[in-house]
From Swiss-Prot:
Organism name: Rhodopseudomonas palustris (strain BisB18)
Protein name from the UniProt record: ATP synthase subunit a
Membership in a protein family: Belongs to the ATPase A chain family.
TM region positions: 30-50, 84-104, 114-134, 143-163, 196-216, 221-241
Gene designation: atpB
Function: Key component of the proton channel; it plays a direct role in the translocation of protons across the membrane.
Secretion signal span: none
GO MF annotation, one: proton-transporting ATP synthase activity, rotational mechanism
Cell compartments where the protein resides: Cell inner membrane
Primary localization class, coarse: membrane
Keyword terms: ATP synthesis, Cell inner membrane, Cell membrane, CF(0), Hydrogen ion transport, Ion transport, Membrane, Transmembrane, Transmembrane helix, Transport
GO CC annotation, single: proton-transporting ATP synthase complex
Membrane topology listed for this record: Multi-pass membrane protein
Amino acid sequence: MIDPIHQFNIEKIFTIGHIGGQEIAFTNSSAYMLVAVAVISLLMIGGVAGRQMVPGRIQSLAEISYEFVAGTIRSTAGVEGLKFFPLVFSLFMFIMISNMVGIIPYTFTITSHLIVTAALALLVFLTVLIYGFYRNGLGFFKIFVPSGVPVFILPLVVFIEVFSFFLRPISHSVRLFANMLAGHIALKVFASFIPLLAGLGIAGYFGAVLPLGMVIALTALELLVAFLQAYVFAILTCIYLNDALHAGH
């Protein structure tokens, strides 16, 4: 059977240089990050260039993406949250496009690596932390003290709030990583059954119909998951940014 884990191997394409004895290399992961950025850039440039009253497909996709993210920010972080639109939009589009590119056979899914999702989650966490203190000063600590909590259980509640706050980047990154990893492993496993069964002759061809159907169904499901995981990451980012914007509310 084909190794379902092999698709996640990071392979060096060429060496860029060395820093402190550590090799800096351009890998397949780096290449697909550039592919994702290129696709997003082409979509947005194509949507803006030659705008028409009756939008075409590219313009419609760009406008729908823009309005969808802007609406998500307004509903979770308020109008003030729109100052973070470039961050949230970039994260949403980068994750969604990366997820969808990874569904194409023989490509690479960069979001199936924890180091990538952890870097994105830490970016959000540090943005919330830095802006929270910049905007609110020590008043940012109010997010750890929910209003209306009885005094006798307040220390426990504060401990839980602080603990959950510092767990945010872990849960934020692992959720995306685990979903993409599990989905692609399942796809690879079912896909590997198709040539194995087809090699058994006529009976095998009939038997291969079931895993083929599963692959088609899982691919459709993975397309949905690719969007949903990008949306979940974006909306959690908005919720966390809301804490920095409205500490203590």
